Amino acid sequence: MQLRVERKFETFSYLPPLNDQQIARQLQYALSNGYSPAIEFSFTGKAEDLVWTLWKLPLFGAQSPEEVLSEIQACKQQFPNAYIRVVAFDSIRQVQTLMFLVYKPL
């Protein structure tokens, strides 16, 4: 018997996958706090991978969650076999404040 173990990446991975509306709410929280979102992807999705590939540049001028969601969709289309996550950075404290997975390949 083959047992498939699903990887857990962060807190949200213990919940059902986030839909676009839930992702938009998280993005709205980040933007309303002045955080700069960025999209990263990895083909292995290993938690121990410290460096994921950055999709384009961080979205410093993003005003709405829809802008970020459209970039997430573009990343999914370009790399359908990659894990995709959103990270947000606080430029005042110069730290990463938020990170969550938005797409896992089948």
UniProtKB/Swiss-Prot annotation:
Keywords: Calvin cycle, Carbon dioxide fixation, Cyanelle, Photorespiration, Photosynthesis, Plastid
Molecular function (Gene Ontology), one example: ribulose-bisphosphate carboxylase activity
Disulfide bridge partners, by residue number: none
Subcellular locations according to the entry: Plastid, Cyanelle
CDD domains: RuBisCO_small
Cytoplasm listed as a keyword: no
Alphabetical GO biological process terms: reductive pentose-phosphate cycle
Chief subcellular location: plastid
One cellular component (GO) term of this entry: chloroplast
Protein function: RuBisCO catalyzes two reactions: the carboxylation of D-ribulose 1,5-bisphosphate, the primary event in carbon dioxide fixation, as well as the oxidative fragmentation of the pentose substrate. Both reactions occur simultaneously and in competition at the same active site. Although the small subunit is not catalytic it is essential for maximal activity.
Additional record remark: The basic functional RuBisCO is composed of a large chain homodimer in a 'head-to-tail' conformation. In form I RuBisCO this homodimer is arranged in a barrel-like tetramer with the small subunits forming a tetrameric 'cap' on each end of the 'barrel'.
UniProt similarity note: Belongs to the RuBisCO small chain family.
Subunit annotation: Heterohexadecamer of 8 large and 8 small subunits.
Protein name, UniProt field: Ribulose bisphosphate carboxylase small subunit
Source organism of this protein record: Cyanophora paradoxa
